[in-house]
Amino acid sequence: SALEAIEEMGYPVVLKPVVGSWGRLIAKVTDRAGAEAILEHKEYLGAYYHSIFYIQEYVEKPGRDIRAFVIGGETVGAVYRSSEHWITNTAKGAKTSKCELSSELNEICQKAGNAIGNGVLAIDLMESKNGFLVNEINYTVEFRNSIEPTGVNIPGKIIDYVISEAR
């Protein structure tokens, strides 16, 4: 059961819908009572999509995560998404700033993109005590608040890529 998996992973954990965006319906669970309450809500909300979710290890991060943009196998830019809240999504108020692409970050993004066949991707990473961790690979790319800090015309790069693939 989900409760057993949570107990096995250890607290805190993050419960996250399989389909979702903008940091919605994500819960940080810090103890068994919280887990039981959230799981009960999911069970009785009734909609099928509430019954399928990820259980992720909670990762301590420095008040930010990284969103990198990979288009056609090329990492074109990245931003930090910073927030005082543990959810570092711009739709939830996080602020963006430029993230320099180190060779390590670029290599991880390349490998993540290659693992799923590339295309147009937004790869969300976290900085942990063990290095970079890939949290999500998004094929529906949200680049709001990312064009200015990166200095990259992300929609233009997407259009160029799509045209080149169509030829």
What spans do the regions from the language model cover?
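A short glycine-rich, hydrophobically flanked beta-strand micro-motif that places a catalytic Asp/Glu
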Residues: 56-57, 118-129
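C-terminal active-site "lid" helix and adjoining low-complexity regulatory extension at the edge
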Residues: 114, 127-167
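Short strand-connecting beta-turns/loops that link adjacent beta-strands
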Residues: 20, 73, 128-131
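Protein kinase-like catalytic core scaffold
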Residues: 13, 54, 77, 121, ...
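Phosphate-binding site of ATP-dependent enzymes
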Residues: 24-116
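Short, solvent-exposed loop/turn segments at secondary-structure junctions
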Residues: 20, 83, 140
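Residues within well-ordered alpha-helical secondary structure of globular protein domains
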Residues: 8, 41-44, 164
